[in-house]
């Protein structure tokens, strides 16, 4: 996929209305935002547009899954209030995202206006599908999708996309239909910069650290990365499927992925063919149940895990074993924790990898943390500033690493 896209930095925005797709899909409990991280992440692009004397910045985003219905539970109103505080200037919140009233409000706003539209997913035309009032599946009428996109296009003169978290979706607000110039915002740009380092011409040694539960979910990721990396660490629930197939290990009640097990040997074959060193755990920290208060025991690959116990983290020997490839890597991509880091007794494996990645970064290694759970690990241990890049998109970063084209990126104007 081509990563070289037109950037907001290279646009002349003076006197222009900027329609910007952002990712304000923040967690909200009882009308209160519990983490404003995604709003903070969009501030740089908004401020840059304003400093370039844009007439207005019109922001559009989704929140949650209203499935094409106007569900007040998913209103962006609390986001408008938070954005006003963070920006230190007034934010005009519109109670819709398309239609004549919205078009009128965005036609000739006061210079320097920041306008936030209501949730784009209140319309089935955003995702192209949704649910009707009785919960039945509905598909959007293509003519109405065209109309929806045309109404959005009337709200700005230039289109900027800064929503990497949704870049793997070909949704209406992500495509910039009707705009001559479609540019990447600063956040999206940063994501592309780091992922192009990993996927275009990576330095050696390039290490991938992969965790997560199912091999089947990560087949494409492993396949694609085996063509690029020099070493690969496999941890998490996924490791048990590998070890049962390869070593006939007794895994007790640990996760086993029947579907994924069929492809393990093929993946190992590919690793050998490509000269990729695979690192699998040699010991585990186990629990008698999947719970924070589980009784803790240890097990090795040779001895196996007894019935009634499950592996929930990698053990001390494995932590030592994994430290060496991390220390020698020039580039690290990490997607998925090696253990159940949410439970303190089973967090040491993930913490030791995190410590290793932070130390390597300090020594000049480029470290890229895939979104989702791995990004949560960085938040948990306050290491966001101690690694090179924490991705804002779990699904989008995964699809990029799988070698897929992201529609939201492909739609942007080439640089």
UniProtKB/Swiss-Prot annotation:
Cofactor: Mg(2+)
Pfam families for this protein: PGK
Location in or out of the cell: Cytoplasm
Binding residues annotated for ATP, in chain numbering: 213, 218, 237, 311, 342, 373-374
GO annotations of cellular component type: cytosol; M band; synapse; Z disc
Disruption phenotype: RNAi-mediated knockdown is lethal. Glial-specific RNAi-mediated knockdown is viable but eclosed adults present with locomotor defects. Neuronal-specific RNAi-mediated knockdown is viable with no defects. Conditional RNAi-mediated knockdown in adult glial cells results in reduced lifespan due to neurodegeneration. Conditional RNAi-mediated knockdown in adult neuronal cells has no effect on lifespan.
Domain of life, source organism: Eukaryota
Major place of residence: cytoplasm
List of residues binding AMP: 213-214, 218, 237, 311, 342
Residues that bind (2R)-3-phosphoglycerate: 22-25, 37-38, 61-62, 64-65, 121, 168-169
Protein name as annotated: Phosphoglycerate kinase
Organism of origin: Drosophila melanogaster (Fruit fly)
Underlying gene: Pgk
